[in-house]
């Protein structure tokens, strides 16, 4: 049930991202040009034990990153993450 909830949440996020108006995309375009190809963002999941994201995606002791490109050596693709209205790969070690 938790996995289903996570998948539905990711689907809704993807649909919302694609439903943005062209004006919103035009405003965001200059910011996206400044993003470097090798930039990564550290994702930390806080909150109560047993949250849907912690149970479905992140196990204790794992470090996850929101990657623009492919996962680096030693990481595996675990899911998707969003940043500035775009969907990226969630890579965990």
Swiss-Prot record:
Gene Ontology CC: one annotated term: extracellular space
Molecular functions (GO terms): protein homodimerization activity
SS bond list: 64-92, 66-81, 71-91
Biological process annotations from GO: antibacterial humoral response; antimicrobial humoral immune response mediated by antimicrobial peptide; cellular response to lipopolysaccharide; defense response; defense response to fungus; defense response to Gram-negative bacterium; defense response to Gram-positive bacterium; disruption of plasma membrane integrity in another organism
Keyword tRNA-binding part of the UniProt annotation: no
Record SMART domains: Defensin_propep, DEFSN
Positions annotated as propeptide: 20-62
InterPro entries named among the record's database cross-references: Alpha-defensin, Alpha-defensin_C, Alpha-defensin_N, Beta/alpha-defensin_C
Compartments in which it is found: Secreted
Function recorded in the entry: Host-defense peptide that has antimicrobial activity against Gram-positive and Gram-negative bacteria and fungi (in vitro). Exhibits activity against E.coli, A.calcoaceticus, S,aureus and C.albicans.
Pfam families per UniProt: Defensin_1, Defensin_propep
Signal peptide: 1-19
The protein's name: Defensin alpha 4
UniProt record similarity statement: Belongs to the alpha-defensin family.
Primary location class: secreted
Tissue specificity: Expressed in neutrophils (at protein level). Highest expression in bone marrow and to a much lesser extent in small intestine.
Keywords, comma-separated and alphabetical: Antibiotic, Antimicrobial, Defensin, Disulfide bond, Fungicide, Secreted, Signal
């Amino acid at each position: 049930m938790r996995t289903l909830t996570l998948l539905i949440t990711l689907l809704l996020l993807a649909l919302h991202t694609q439903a943005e108006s062209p004006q919103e995309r035009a405003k965001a375009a200059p910011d996206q040009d400044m993003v470097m190809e090798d930039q990564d963002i550290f994702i930390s999941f806080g909150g109560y034990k047993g949250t849907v994201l912690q149970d479905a995606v992140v196990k204790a002791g794992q470090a996850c990153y929101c990657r623009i490109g492919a996962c680096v050596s030693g990481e595996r693709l675990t899911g998707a993450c969003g940043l500035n209205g775009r969907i990226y790969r969630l890579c965990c070690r």
